[in-house]
Swiss-Prot record:
Belongs to the UPF0262 family. Signal peptide: none annotated. It comes from the Bacteria. This is UPF0262 protein Oant_0325.
Length: 160
């Protein structure tokens, strides 16, 4: 992270509400991810030397992920539009394993739940790394921030 940039962090994250709401499990994941992201993150739009803190609005448009970044006071900083193609497979696989996980926590043995959860975490890490790589040269984030952002990308997909 660029040490010289003051307040290189997010103070607010908003998801495009026009997509609608999802299941209670997905909405819970969204709320936890946003809370955790705001509590602890490292976020710096490349080329912005003024510094944050920043607000982020995530949305989907025509199979593209949009990162609209402003300063805390509302001044536009940058908008980055990313193709979702590199994330599609891992997001699809993550959806499938999450469905298995949500079913398992209701009736499966602890060892089966643990095995599914390990696979779920592995896919989540893979998606987080892919997202971090896609943001390279645009937005500098640490891995934990990328993990929470990947969760929100998945929530947008679940809604859309």
């Amino acid at each position: 992270m660029t040490a010289a940039v003051p307040n290189a962090r997010l103070v607010d994250v908003e998801l495009d509400e026009s997509i609608g709401r999802s299941t209670p499990d997905v909405e819970h994941e969204r709320a936890v991810a946003i809370f955790d992201l705001i509590e602890e993150n490292s976020f710096h739009p490349i080329g912005d030397d003024t510094g944050g803190p920043y607000r982020l609005k995530l949305s989907l448009m025509e199979s593209r992920l949009i990162f609209a970044i402003t300063r805390e006071a509302g001044e536009d900083v940058a908008t980055h539009i990313l193709s979702l193609t590199p994330l599609r497979r891992v997001v699809r696989d993550y959806f499938m394993i999450c469905e298995s996980y949500y079913q398992a926590i209701r009736s499966a043995t602890p060892s089966k739940i643990e095995a599914i959860d390990m696979g779920r975490r592995g896919l989540h890490n893979e998606g987080s790394q892919t997202l971090q790589n896609r943001l390279q040269g645009k937005i500098e984030v640490d891995f934990n921030t990328a993990r929470r952002l990947f969760t929100l990308v998945c929530v947008l997909h679940w809604r859309g």
